[in-house]
UniProtKB/Swiss-Prot annotation:
This protein's name: Alpha-L-rhamnosidase
Keywords, sorted A to Z: Calcium, Hydrolase, Metal-binding
Purpose of the protein: Alpha-L-rhamnosidase which is able to degrade p-nitrophenyl-alpha-L-rhamnopyranoside (PNP-Rha) in vitro. Releases L-rhamnose from citrus flavonoids such as naringin, rutin and hesperidin, and the arabinogalactan-protein (AGP) gum arabic. AGPs are a family of proteoglycans that are localized on the cell surfaces of higher plants. Cleaves both the alpha-1,6 and the alpha-1,2-linked rhamnosyl residues.
Binding, alpha-L-rhamnose 1: 630, 634-636, 643, 695, 916
Active site: 636 (proton donor), 895 (proton acceptor)
Length: 1030
């Protein structure tokens, strides 16, 4: 009997995955053993249609395969069938020929595996529910002072109009916008207001407000206060659309409104206020004219779709819901929410592909009447995306749903989305990823997700087949979910009635609100990362992202509200309109991210470094949300390639990032231009560029980082054709293999600009070098890439490296890139490294690097014999340094080294995120050199364990969950001695580096001395726990 035991088998990185489309899913089986030095010599996999059938498998038996492969082993049996659960088990043989017990049965289940298996139709809510009122016919108006379309004072003006309305109103919708902000009331009741945005361009995004509950037959008074934030064009515009039995009636903003430039007395919003002395408003410009152009409101409600059906009185053996959306959806079946996913189906380029989800709903279906329902919201498909506004992919969110029910007698049936579904509006009045969600609990539709609900007044859906993407594929990455909750720690009241709740941690997600009050009471929740000096929330850095959730109470005891279709980056929540004073239990943070296990535990004797690790982890947690975003708070939240280029190696330490980044690499390849350029962001959106050094190269560096971390050869195989096209693009757009001096450069460096041609050519060489390594790992011809690298290297040295080792630009990043990418002649490496250290010393031992130089800075110093300088930089506490933001109270990584400046002021708000993981790329160095854990071979088949004591660090401990099993280290330096305990999992080996000038000084267990190198005694060990003492 073998001493090996299989633990936690997984398929495509997941234990028991539901809904795989992979034709040859990869199987992994970590192992455990009480005996040291255990390795696998062979394995046998069995696959069957039932757990009981594994002893005589009816699908596949690999037989005994002589191999030590135990991670990502492809299924090699007969073709898999769609919608089928496959059970599997594995046993292994050790090096002595002993066989293990069979692992406990596990399973994976296939999804639909192709377009032919879909019979559902795309459906959308009808036009009345998805189209916003047009402002055409309205005018931009202002107080009559000069020419407001050209220039008006920075001031507030007030406007009123009384209108006579009929008694048969069935709908009332107000569309309104102002340059810059407004508050609007109907008969004294405020129905909407806006706050000043950092870009002062909120007028580009007119609001759409349902005011049916506020209007009535007879005279109604509309009142607007509008403010011009600075000297310049001023105006506001609106249309009130009334639906009556006899048709539509529209009330426009025009010269019939009254206006004043003197702040009116209390009650000016009320119907009986005397405005006879107010002059008529002035038309500044007709809609479509003036400086504002053809601004258009956008309908952003989350509509409700439903369908009832009957099932026979037969025993159900299995039921699955396959669903997706153009937009976002949340499915319900017979009154129960389906699954726990948030923001499904996530973000892709919907023109090319959308991911579908698979849910086990066996326990939810029932004989007789059933109801399948869903909320459908705009999301990334039709809502605001980044700074580019709405409708980046389409205007009408749509749903695709297919419920498949199988019975014990072998029969089955499908219930699909189609023309027989019904649609209506609901309590989610608006839902936008950037602006936030507006929820009116008075509009809740009791029972609409359950059978027996009367939907005869609902509207018929319409088809959406013209908008369908090219491919519908099973979800590759984990779903977005609520991972944890954070209670509020403190409540302050910086202004009367304005409460600020501190969650203690900059996070991403939304909040749960608990509140009691009268029906119609409206509570506003605004989100921010930091506070102003006066204790109010600081929102200028959010730019146009309103980040505001609004809840209107229904007045039925304690009410709970959790937004469904938005997310925010925040630590602080401003609460206004709350009945009474909120307590710390009134608001709870709901932390949201793409689900994946966290894989790295790390602690040292230096509190600042422990906090740095926490900030790195929280930064990744918040920005790994469907795509790797640059920031989760402001109006951007895009999949910037440059950020993940530098952060991917760290990401693969701290979280299981294989599935998430594999999915994103598909997004990146979907965005690749026809001539081979990778885009600045993926999914590609807006008018951003492509072909940029250090950004587009993510198409090369990210697959390589994943391969190093997981040994996933399929990532390389999928990437190499696009990498080849990228290199052809770069070569085509070079002059003598030197790239042009354009792009973003060493973004946000500290007054130390590196020439952009140096950066671009260095990255060109680096991508060619990695392409050669990829080809070698895949058994393909690497010679063309090696030759390309050699030629670029020579051109680089000729153009940029002087005979004394100085590099053009003479900046820290110039030397960092040149040294780390092997572009300096060997004879000049020491001179270049010494020059780098001199530049650091000249800045009083501070760094000056930006996004591209920072991740390579400490590794280069270590590789060139300057680990002491690396530690000196790591421990710095003054600007610019990693310690500076921590001393300023950061709980995530900042976009800038000085997002909060030494005097307490904020950096420029246009580019000042407090949750931006790029500078967290230092984690890779910390985990490899302080924890001492790094891959010696791809996927940690061999582990390099090399803690490097230095600086203030005298002890550290870490555990890394590799695909083979946990790798751990714990070390301490004391009284001139050194103690290391480490463990590595079965079927791996480790090379352990002990700081000792002679192996005889090292006491150890199970280790074999192999060489002395670089002041260390190097030992080889097998699996198990080991102790080394100097």
């Amino acid at each position: 009997m073998s001493a090996l035991r299989v633990t936690s088998p997984s398929v495509e990185y997941v234990q028991r995955p539901l809904g795989l489309d992979a034709a040859h899913p990869r199987l992994s089986w970590p192992m455990a053993s009480a005996a040291p030095g255990r390795r696998q010599s062979a394995y046998q996999v069995r696959v069957a249609s039932s757990a009981a059938g594994l002893s005589h498998p009816d699908v596949w038996d690999s037989g005994k395969v002589v191999s030590d492969d135990s991670v990502l082993v492809p299924y090699a049996g007969p073709p898999l069938k769609p919608r089928t659960r496959y059970f599997w088990s594995v046993r292994v043989w050790d090096a002595d020929g002993g066989a293990s017990e069979w692992s406990a049965p596990s399973w994976w289940e296939t999804g639909l595996m192709g377009a032919s298996q879909w019979s559902a139709k795309w459906i959308s809510a009808p036009a009345p529910l998805t189209e916003a009122p047009s402002l055409e016919g309205s005018s931009w108006i202002w107080f009559p002072e000069g020419e407001p379309a050209n220039s008006a004072p920075a001031a507030t003006r007030w406007f009123r109009r009384t209108v006579d309305l009929p008694d048969d109103i069935t709908g009332a919708t107000l569309a309104i916008s102002a340059d810059n902000v407004y508050a609007v009331s109907v008969d004294g009741a405020e129905v909407a207001r806006t706050d000043l945005e950092a870009d002062n361009e909120g007028w580009r995004r007119p609001a759409v407000i349902d005011v049916l509950d506020h209007v009535h037959s007879g005279n109604n008074t509309l009142a607007v206060s509008a403010s011009n934030a600075s000297v310049g064009p001023a105006g506001w515009i609106c249309v009130l659309v009334l639906t009556t039995a006899s048709g539509e009636k529209k009330i426009f903003s025009d010269a019939s409104w009254k206006s004043t430039d003197h702040e009116p007395a209390d009650g000016w919003r009320e119907p009986d206020f005397d405005d006879s002395g107010w002059p008529a408003a002035k038309v500044a410009a007709a809609w479509g004219a003036g400086p504002w152009g053809r601004v258009a409101p956008v309908a952003s409600a989350a509509n409700q779709l439903r369908h009832e059906f009957r099932l026979p009185h037969k025993k159900v053996s299995r039921a699955r819901l396959y669903a997706t959306a153009l937009g976002l959806y949340e499915a319900h079946l017979n009154g129960r929410r389906v699954g726990r996913d948030q923001l499904a189906p996530g973000w892709t380029d919907y023109r090319k592909r959308v991911q579908y989800q698979t849910y086990d709903v066996t326990s939810s279906v029932r004989p007789g009447a059933n109801a399948l329902a869903a909320y459908v919201a705009p999301g990334w498909y039709a809502g605001n995306v980044g700074m580019f506004g709405p409708h980046q992919y389409g205007e009408r969110p749509a749903l695709l749903a297919q419920l498949e029910v199988e019975y014990a007698d072998g029969t089955s049936e499908r219930i699909t989305s189609g023309p027989d579904w019904r649609a209506a509006s609901g309590p989610i009045v608006s839902a936008d990823l950037l602006s936030g969600e507006t929820y009116d609990a008075r509009k809740e539709t009791a029972g609409w997700t359950s059978p027996g609900f009367d939907d005869r007044a609902w509207l018929a859906v319409r088809g959406a087949d013209n908008d369908v993407p090219e491919q519908i594929v099973a979800q590759v990455d984990g779903p977005v979910r609520i991972a944890k909750e954070l209670p509020a720690r403190k409540v302050t009241e910086p202004k009367p009635g304005v409460f600020v709740l501190d969650l203690g941690q900059n996070m991403v997600g939304s909040v749960r609100l608990r509140v009691s009050g009268d029906a119609g009471t409206t509570v506003r929740l605004r989100h921010a990362e930091v506070l102003n000096p006066d204790g109010t929330i600081y929102t200028a850095n959010l730019r146009s992202a309103a980040a505001t959730d609004t809840y209107t109470l229904k007045g039925q005891g304690e009410e709970t509200y959790e937004p469904r279709f938005t997310f925010h980056g925040f630590r602080y929540v401003e609460v206004t309109g709350f009945p009474g004073k909120p307590s710390t239990t009134s608001v709870t943070g709901r932390v949201m991210h793409t689900s994946a296990p966290f894989t790295f535990e790390f602690e040292t004797n230096v509190p600042m470094l422990n906090k740095l690790h926490s900030n790195i982890t929280w930064g990744q947690r918040g920005n790994f949300l469907s795509v790797p975003t640059d920031t989760p708070a402001r109006d951007e939240r895009l999949g910037w390639t440059g950020d993940i280029n530098v952060f991917a190696p760290t990401a693969a330490y701290t979280m299981e990032s294989a599935r998430f980044l594999t999915k994103w690499l598909v997004d990146l390849r979907d965005a690749q231009t026809s001539d081979g350029a990778f885009t600045d962001v993926a999914p590609a959106v807006g008018n951003l560029g492509n072909g940029v050094a250090g950004w587009g190269d993510a198409g090369v560096t990210v697959p390589w980082a994943l391969y190093q971390a997981y040994g996933d050869r399929q990532v390389l195989a999928d990437a190499l054709p696009s990498v080849h096209a990228w290199l052809r693009y770069l070569e085509k757009h070079s002059d003598g293999l030197l790239r042009p001096a354009d792009g973003y450069g060493d973004w946000l460096n500290v007054s130390d600009e590196t020439p952009k041609d140096v950066i671009a050519t260095a990255y060109f060489a680096h991508s060619a070098d990695l392409a050669a390594r990829m080809a070698t790992e895949l058994g393909k011809d690497a010679a063309p890439y090696t030759d390309l690298f050699t030629r670029i290297r020579k051109a680089f040295q000729t153009a940029y490296v002087a005979s004394d080792g100085k590099v053009k630009g003479d900046t820290q990043s110039a030397y960092v890139l040149t040294l780390s990418m092997n572009l300096v002649p060997d004879a000049l490496r020491k001179a270049a490294a010494d020059r780098l250290v001199a530049l650091i010393e000249a800045k009083d031992w501070h760094l000056s690097t930006g996004f591209l130089g920072t991740p390579r800075l400490l590794p280069v110093l270590t590789d060139t014999g300057h680990t002491d300088v690396a530690y000196r930089l790591l421990h710095q506490r003054t600007f610019p340094s990693w310690g500076y933001p921590i001393d300023k109270g950061s709980t995530t990584m900042w976009e800038r080294w000085d997002s909060i400046q030494p005097d307490g002021g904020f950096q420029t708000p246009e580019m000042n995120s407090f949750n931006h993981y790029a500078y967290g790329s230092v984690g890779e160095w910390m985990y490899a050199n302080i924890a001492g854990i790094a891959p010696g071979r791809a996927g940690y088949r061999q582990v390099v364990i090399r803690p490097r004591p230095g600086g203030e660090v005298t002890s550290a401990r870490a555990t890394f969950a590799s695909l083979h099993g946990p790798v751990s280290t714990r070390w301490q330096q004391r009284s001139g001695g050194f103690v290391l305990t480490c463990s590595v999992p079965p079927n791996t080996t480790a090379e352990v580096w002990i700081p000792a000038d002679h192996p005889d000084r090292v006491q150890h267990t199970h280790g074999t001395f192999v060489r002395a190198e670089d002041g260390c005694a190097v030992f080889e060990v097998g699996s198990g726990s080991h102790r080394f003492t100097v």
